[in-house]
Amino acid sequence: MAAADAEAVPARGEPQQDCCVKTELLGEETPMAADEGSAEKQAGEAHMAADGETNGSCENSDASSHANAAKHTQDSARVNPQDGTNTLTRIAENGVSERDSEAAKQNHVTADDFVQTSVIGSNGYILNKPALQAQPLRTTSTLASSLPGHAAKTLPGGAGKGRTPSAFPQTPAAPPATLGEGSADTEDRKLPAPGADVKVHRARKTMPKSVVGLHAASKDPREVREARDHKEPKEEINKNISDFGRQQLLPPFPSLHQSLPQNQCYMATTKSQTACLPFVLAAAVSRKKKRRMGTYSLVPKKKTKVLKQRTVIEMFKSITHSTVGSKGEKDLGASSLHVNGESLEMDSDEDDSEELEEDDGHGAEQAAAFPTEDSRTSKESMSEADRAQKMDGESEEEQESVDTGEEEEGGDESDLSSESSIKKKFLKRKGKTDSPWIKPARKRRRRSRKKPSGALGSESYKSSAGSAEQTAPGDSTGYMEVSLDSLDLRVKGILSSQAEGLANGPDVLETDGLQEVPLCSCRMETPKSREITTLANNQCMATESVDHELGRCTNSVVKYELMRPSNKAPLLVLCEDHRGRMVKHQCCPGCGYFCTAGNFMECQPESSISHRFHKDCASRVNNASYCPHCGEESSKAKEVTIAKADTTSTVTPVPGQEKGSALEGRADTTTGSAAGPPLSEDDKLQGAASHVPEGFDPTGPAGLGRPTPGLSQGPGKETLESALIALDSEKPKKLRFHPKQLYFSARQGELQKVLLMLVDGIDPNFKMEHQNKRSPLHAAAEAGHVDICHMLVQAGANIDTCSEDQRTPLMEAAENNHLEAVKYLIKAGALVDPKDAEGSTCLHLAAKKGHYEVVQYLLSNGQMDVNCQDDGGWTPMIWATEYKHVDLVKLLLSKGSDINIRDNEENICLHWAAFSGCVDIAEILLAAKCDLHAVNIHGDSPLHIAARENRYDCVVLFLSRDSDVTLKNKEGETPLQCASLNSQVWSALQMSKALQDSAPDRPSPVERIVSRDIARGYERIPIPCVNAVDSEPCPSNYKYVSQNCVTSPMNIDRNITHLQYCVCIDDCSSSNCMCGQLSMRCWYDKDGRLLPEFNMAEPPLIFECNHACSCWRNCRNRVVQNGLRARLQLYRTRDMGWGVRSLQDIPPGTFVCEYVGELISDSEADVREEDSYLFDLDNKDGEVYCIDARFYGNVSRFINHHCEPNLVPVRVFMAHQDLRFPRIAFFSTRLIEAGEQLGFDYGERFWDIKGKLFSCRCGSPKCRHSSAALAQRQASAAQEAQEDGLPDTSSAAAADPL
C-alpha cells in the first residue's frame, strides 16, 4: 500500500533501521464502553511469498534491512515487555522457542522470503526477527531524539496538541467501567530492566497532521430476466368453479337483453350453460388461473368427467319427444343445451343446491328449507301482478320462510352443476313426464316468484326476438342486492353517486356485475335439429378462415349433433375433422370461423392446450380484453402465424362474396342462420361490430364507468364515515352477503355494494382462497378504485396485508399504473419496502412495466432504495433496461441508480442492454461510465451477449468503444464464435478482428481482468482486479476479510450493558439522539454523507447507532456499518504497484471503505517484519493497538499515499464503544471522479522512517515526500547544522531514494 510503491534502495553501510510507530496525540476523552463491531471473520492462513509490491514499503525482499530508529520521546519510556537481554531465548506468543528445531518453521517460509529469522507470531506466521545481537541500543542512535515511533499510518490530528474541547462531547455518560477496563494491559506493562534493549520500531500509517487543502474543495450534488412471470398455481377446475360460481347473476331488467347474446331464451340450463356463458369478471384478475378447457368441474370436491359422445337413441330413449309444437317451441327446443344428450330443467336448481350444500355440510338445513314440487307448481300459476303483490305484501313469517330456504339453498355455492350431478338429477326425474323442451322462460319466472330475495329489483321483460318472455338468471348464490330506494334510509341522498360515472346509483345497482367474461362452448353438444340438418344437406357447415379469405367445407357429415364455439355463433352440423378441431378450440368464438391459416391470436393457459381466435374477436369488458375461450387476459396471448397446409383442401372458396344479412356474425339460434353465404373477415368484423345490441357498451354496462381515482371525485372521507354510521343504525333486516362477494364488488368498483356489505359486518380482510388469498383491498388497488380503497381502510382493512405470493395492495396499484391509488396508499401509511415472494418491491414492478410517473413518485417519497435488489439480484434499473424503458433509465440514473450493480450471475446493466438490443440505453450507460469490459459468472462480456443475441447496433457501439473482440469466456468462446456464422454481426466482428491483427504497431497491453472480484463475494459490491501494465497476477499473498479479525485475545469490551444508546423514534436526525450527542451531533445527512461543516483536518469521533438503540436499522446515523457501497477497482499502476480507483463519481463526504485487517497489540507490532500495512489506533489512555493488513485485509490495504488526499480516515464506533479499538472509515474529502485513484495521507511519522527507503510518487504539485522535496530538506538540514557548528549527521540519511 505504498505511498509510492516504488522500489526502495536501502542506504549502504547504515545500520539496520527500526520501523517506527505513529501515534496520535489525543486530548481528554470522555470515558465510555467498548467493542469492535461485527463478528470477526477468522480467515485462513495467507501465503508469505513476496509479490514484489508493498504499497508503502520497499518492493524488494530486503525490506528488513531498514536502519533501526529510536522512538519519539513520548514513547521512549515504553519498553517492549518481550525484550530481554540479547542473549536470552525469545519465545513467541504461541509458545514456540526460537531455539526449537527447524521443523517448527519449515511449513511457513523459504530462505528467500521476507522472514529472516524464526519467531512465530500469534497469527501463526513466522515473523522476521533480525539478529538481536546486531540491534543497536536506541539510546545510542543519532536519530533517537528526533524520530517518532513506528512508521505506521496514523489518524489526522495535530501532533503534540491535546484535542480541543469541541472534538469530543463532555457528556456525563457514566459508563459502568472506566476506559480500558476489562484489559490488564496497563497493569501488565513491565518497567525496563537496567541495560535492557529498547523495543523495535515498526512503520505504521497514522492520521495525518493538519494540511492545507485537506478540506473538501467543492460540493457536488450528486439506481434476466423477468422474474420469470409468476408461476401461478394450477388449481383444480372444481375450485375455479366453486369460486366463480359464488358470484351473483344480477337481476333482470329491460336492458339486460341487449347486453347478452340474442335469441338464446336464456335456456333453462343455467347450470351447464354457465360453463360456456360468462364467468364473472374474476377471470380478468391478475392472479391468473389455469383452466383445463372442456373439463370444467362445476361441483366442488367432485372429479370432473370428460364429455363423451352418445348416440341419438341413448340420448332420447327415456325422453318423450313432443312431435307437435309451434315453431317457437322448436326454436326453444333447439336452443336448449344438452350435455351428453341430457336436457337440463330449471326445476333442478333446488336439487343442485341441495347437493352442493351437502358437499359443504349443510344438507340438514337444506332438506328442511326446500319448497316442494307442488308448491313450485302452484307458484308457477301465479300472474306477474300476483307475484309483485306477493313480494310487497307477503307476511313476514312467510317471507322469512322463503328467504331462509332460498338463502340456505344458495349459500355460498355456485348455481353451476357438473356433468355428474346432472346425471344424478336426470335419474331422479327419469319417470317424470315433463318435456325437456318446455319453455325455459316460464320456469325462470317460477323461480323468480318463489325467490324474490334472490334477485331484488328484478323485472320481467320481453325478448327482442319476440318469441318468448324471458327473465335473466336470478342470483342463486344467496347474496342480497338491495337498491337504496328500497331501504328507505336517511342517507340515501348521501350514498347516491356524487361523481359522474361512479357505479353507485340505484339504477346502476341493477346492472352491476353483468360484465362477465364469456367463455366458449367448443366442447358442448346440442341434439340434432331437423331444420338445421335439412339445411345442411349432409354437408359440413364449417366456415374456415384462410389468409383473410373465407371458405366452406364440403365434407360429408357423419354425426348430426350440433356444435358451436359460443352463443354468438349459429349452431352447426360439422364433419368429423371440424368436430375435432372445434373440441381443440380452433374455432373463433367471436365470429364462428375456424382459424385454419393466417395470423391469429393464440392463448395457452396450459402447455397442452391452445385457444385460437381473431384479435378483434377478443372479449372486451371494462376496457380490458380477454380470451373468448377461457377468459384469460388477452395480453397473455401471442400472435401466431399458421401456414396453410399443403394437402388437398376440402374447403372450397366461395366466389362473389357479398355482405351477408344482419344475422351474420351475431348470436343466432334460428335454423336458417347458417345458410347465408360467408363473409370476408373484414365484412365479418364490420358485421359483428354493427350488431352490438343497442345501448350496449363493450367497455362496460351503461352507467357503470370506472370511478375516477381520487377521493375528491367521489364521496369524501367524512361523507363515507357518516354514511357508514347511518347505515349501521338502520341496518336492513333481510340483507345477507357472502364474504366473497366483497372481493368481486371491490374489484368492479361497486361502491354501494361494498358499503352495504361492510355495514352487514363482512370482514374487510377476508381473503379469497382461490385468488391467491388476496383481500378486497388487493382487488380495489389493482383496479385503481381509490374511493373503495379508502372505504376499506376506514373499515379496518390491513393496508399492508399480503397475498399468498406476498403481494401488498401497494404492489398491485404500482404494477397496474394507478398513480392516485399509489399516492393514497402511501399517504395512508402503506409500507413501500416489502418484497413479494420473488423479492420484488413495488419499485421493481413499476420499473418493469415502465410506469414512469409511479416510479417518479415512489422515488420522490424518500423511502425507497433506488438500488434495491430482488431475489435474482436485479435492480429497478436492470428491469427498466431489459424492457427498453429509455426515459425510465434516465430517471433512475438521475436518482442515483448504480449501473454497475451485479445480479446473481454477475451481469451488470450493460449486459442487459446488450441482451435487449437497446442501443440508446447502452449509450446512456456507457456515457455514465458503465464498465464495458465487465464479465459475468460465465465470463461473457456485453460484446459476447450482443453477438450471441445478434444485436448488430450494440455490437457496432461496443466495438467503437474498444471492446475486446478476442476476449474468451469460460467456454473458451470469443464474441466472434458466439455470433451466427456469416451474419451481419459476425461480419462486423470479423472485420474488427482483422483490423486489430493487421495493426503495424501493437498498442500497449490491453487491460485484462485478472480477477472479477478480489472480495470473493464478501462485499456487497464486487471489486474487480485489472492489469494493463505487466503480467503480474492478482495479489494472493493475503486473505481477504471484510471485518477486522484477531489472532490473539484482545479483550474488546462487547458487553451490551456498557453501550450508550438512543431511544429515538425518528430517523435519529434530531439533537435529542444520544448517539449523536456522543459525536457532538449526527454528522450524516439524509444521503448518508458527512455534513459540509465536518472537520476534515481533525475529524472528531463518530458514534453510530448500535444494536442497543431503539431506532430502526435504517436510521440516518448508520452509514459505516452498512458496508462498502462505492464501486472500486484494484488496478496495476505504472510506478506504484497496485492501486485502487473509483469506477463512479463519489460526492464529497461519502463513505468509501474501511481499513480492515488484523487487530494486534503494539508489542506484537514490534516483532512484525513487514510494517507497511500497519495502521496505528492511537489511544493515550492505555495500551496502543494497531491494525495490520499484511496477512488479513480488504481493498483498503492497496490504497496508496497521496499528499493531497481525496480520502480522510475517521474513527467510528458501532457495535461497541471501546475507545481502544475504533474502526477506521475512509470518507471522501472532495468530489472523486470516476477513474481517479484513491489516496490518503499516511502521516509524517510514516515518512520519517520510509522516506529513507523510497520517495512519494503521488505526482501532486504540493508533494512533501518526493525525491526533490527530500533532497531540499536534507540540504537545508545540512546547512543549518554547519551554521550551528554541529557535526553533519545527514550523510547516513542522504542515500538515493531509489
Curated annotation (Swiss-Prot):
SUPFAM superfamilies, A to Z: Ankyrin repeat, SET domain
Catalytic activity: N(6)-methyl-L-lysyl(9)-[histone H3] + S-adenosyl-L-methionine = N(6),N(6)-dimethyl-L-lysyl(9)-[histone H3] + S-adenosyl-L-homocysteine + H(+); L-lysyl(9)-[histone H3] + S-adenosyl-L-methionine = N(6)-methyl-L-lysyl(9)-[histone H3] + S-adenosyl-L-homocysteine + H(+)
Comp. bias (Basic residues): 440-452
Site (Histone H3K9me binding): Y1155
Variant or mutagenesis effect after changing A43V: In a breast cancer sample; somatic mutation
Binding-site residues for Zn(2+) 2, renumbered to this chain: C1062, C1075, C1105, C1109
Protein EC: 2.1.1.-, 2.1.1.367
Domain of life: Eukaryota
ANK repeat ranges per the UniProt record: 737-766, 772-801, 805-834, 838-868, 872-901, 905-934, 938-967, 971-1004
Record note on what altering E882A does: Abolishes binding to methylated RELA K310me1, histone H3K9me1 and H3K9me2
Localization (cell): Nucleus; Chromosome
Cross-link Glycyl lysine isopeptide (Lys-Gly) (interchain with G-Cter in SUMO1), sequence positions: K22
Chain residue ranges for the region called Interaction with histone H3: 1162-1181, 1242-1245
Keywords: Acetylation, ANK repeat, Chromatin regulator, Chromosome, Disease variant, Intellectual disability, Isopeptide bond, Metal-binding, Methyltransferase, Nucleus, Phosphoprotein, Repeat, S-adenosyl-L-methionine, Transferase, Ubl conjugation, Zinc
Biased composition (Acidic residues): 344-360, 394-416
Boundaries of every Pre-SET domain copy: 1060-1123
Keyword Disulfide bond: no
Family: Belongs to the class V-like SAM-binding methyltransferase superfamily.
Entry domain remark: The ANK repeats recognize and bind RELA subunit of NF-kappa-B, when RELA is monomethylated at 'Lys-310'. They also specifically recognize and bind H3K9me1 and H3K9me2.
Protein name: Histone-lysine N-methyltransferase EHMT1
Lineage of source species: Eukaryota, Metazoa, Chordata, Craniata, Vertebrata
